[in-house]
Amino acid sequence: MTIKNIKTGLKLWSVNTDHYLNEAKRLFDLGVFDYIELYVVPDTTDTLSAWKTLNIPFIIHNAHFAHGFNLAKSENKARNKEIYEQSRLFADKLSAKYIIFHGGIDGDANETANQLASFKEQRALIENKPFVALPNRMGGNFCRGATIDELKLIMDTASCGMCFDIGHAVCSANSQNIEPYAFLKQLKTLSPVMYHLSDINDMKSPYDAHPHLGTGNLDIKWVIDEIFHEGACVSVETNKDSKESLEDFKKDICYLKNCQNI
């Protein structure tokens, strides 16, 4: 297996300014990871000064449907713009390389594409999604940006890149009755800029989950070898077992780095 010199990312939320912020600094100083992917919860710009104290590279993740952001519906347009402007502020102040967006739920992919294009955000990346939303949690039915055609439409219209979420892709493949690893290969043709990674317990499920690396059934070594490009940014999006420590994340990173060297 070829060593890909992957750059690993820690996923945090803007409200995580208590224990996780200090833990992030400690682990970064130890060389455990390379950047923070920061999900900006709406109306939390008061936390920006705390994140600015860290001398760590950032990627920004715009808020999604659970926080009222839905690019797929025209009636959300005004609030979508307000939420985006807060993410833009974080990205500007933290010198973030990218801002990641979800395509929304239900609605229409053309609306998603046009609203994202209206931001004129050169750092924008669209993240591929599962085909179906999590039941009893997301309040909708179908995710935009789950298929090759919708992703191409959004990327072409908004002139944006793609954030390739491996787990989301497997979920979408199952909903579309496509062999999961074959669908991963198909998505690779869209030339993704960066990646999200967690393990997968049920490789036949249409629903998203985030188990720790090495605890599920995803062939992570295959993903590294066949999907990730040289020097890729890979945000590890596994569940956090503690509200104070990030040692579980550290173990995930060790597993990922070991997979590169086999």
Label the predicted regions.
Residues 35, 59, 125-127, 163-166, ...:
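Generic enzyme active-site microenvironment
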Residues 12-16, 77, 138-142, 173-174, ...:
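Short, flexible loop segments at the rims of nucleotide/cofactor-binding pockets, characterized by
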Residues 1-86:
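N-terminal pre-domain/capping segments
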Residues 11-15, 39-41, 63-65, 104-106, ...:
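Active-site beta-loop-alpha junctions enriched in small/polar residues
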Residues 70-161, 248:
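Active-site acidic/histidine proton-transfer and metal-coordination neighborhood
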Residues 1-7, 22-29, 81-97, 157-161, ...:
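Histidine-acidic metal/acid-base catalytic patches
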Residues 30-34, 129-137, 167:
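Short, basic, glycine/proline-bearing loop/turn elements
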Residues 40-57, 89, 110-118, 148-155, ...:
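Short amphipathic alpha-helices and their capping/turn segments at secondary-structure boundaries
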